[in-house]
Amino acid sequence: MSSAGLNVGKKNAYTAVKVDPDGDYCTPGAFELERLFWKGCPKYTHVNEVWPNLYIGDEKTALDRYSLEKAGFTHILNAAHGQRNVDTGPEYYQDMTVEYHGVEADDLPTFKLSQFFYSASEFIDNALQDERNKVLVHCAMGRSRSATLVLAYLMIYKNMTVVDAIEQVSRHRCILPNRGFLKQLRELDIELALQRRNTKNSLPSNDDENSTTI
């Protein structure tokens, strides 16, 4: 797909896009992504492990320093950082051995959360390099902002499609990113698929390898 084709796919968020003509996968349209959440999900609880040592939680979980320390959390990503949201910050956890990362985001379809996809994912991935670490990603309810950042992490660092990532997290927690965030995850899915296609096309084919050895 050309860059022009990629832009068309981004503009029409309700149409499936196939980046790799040789593959079977198509990035779903926005409505199809929403349908993935209609399959049902686990009963809502304050915090859930959705990937080894990676948890999604809500404001109540983030404010309970005693339980966080007892559970062994070492890293906290607040996807609702700020005075009008979940107002914690590194000073709130200063008596704990916790590394804090704040993202000032509003749970609005018009908010560009994608600007934080890579920095938040890098924070999570760096933390999980040590298997002793435990990461909590939270917002107010633990369903939209925090879930979106975790989905982006799984897509960027674990090579998952947006469908794979949603299915992985939904098995463990009831999440529901707003429609604007889903569109941004869809754009990320197209971007990553294009990168994978370009990487695959840049590798020498078996025919090329055979011709050089003859």
Curated annotation (Swiss-Prot):
GO terms for biological process: negative regulation of MAPK cascade; protein dephosphorylation. GO terms for cellular component: cytoplasm; nucleus. It catalyses: O-phospho-L-tyrosyl-[protein] + H2O = L-tyrosyl-[protein] + phosphate; O-phospho-L-seryl-[protein] + H2O = L-seryl-[protein] + phosphate; O-phospho-L-threonyl-[protein] + H2O = L-threonyl-[protein] + phosphate. The keyword Nucleotide-binding does not apply. Keywords: Cytoplasm, Hydrolase, Nucleus, Protein phosphatase. Substrate binds at H138, C139, A140, M141, G142, R143, S144, R145. InterPro entries: Atypical_DUSP_subfamA, Dual-sp_phosphatase_cat-dom, Prot-tyrosine_phosphatase-like, Tyr_Pase_AS, Tyr_Pase_dom, TYR_PHOSPHATASE_DUAL_dom. GO terms for molecular function: MAP kinase phosphatase activity; protein serine/threonine phosphatase activity; protein tyrosine phosphatase activity; protein tyrosine/serine/threonine phosphatase activity. CDD domains: DUPD1. Its EC number is 3.1.3.16, 3.1.3.48. Disulfide bonds: none annotated. Dual specificity phosphatase able to dephosphorylate phosphotyrosine, phosphoserine and phosphothreonine residues within the same substrate, with a preference for phosphotyrosine as a substrate. Involved in the modulation of AMPK and MAPK1/2 signaling pathways. This is Dual specificity phosphatase 29. It comes from Gallus gallus (Chicken). The lineage of its organism: Eukaryota, Metazoa, Chordata, Craniata, Vertebrata.
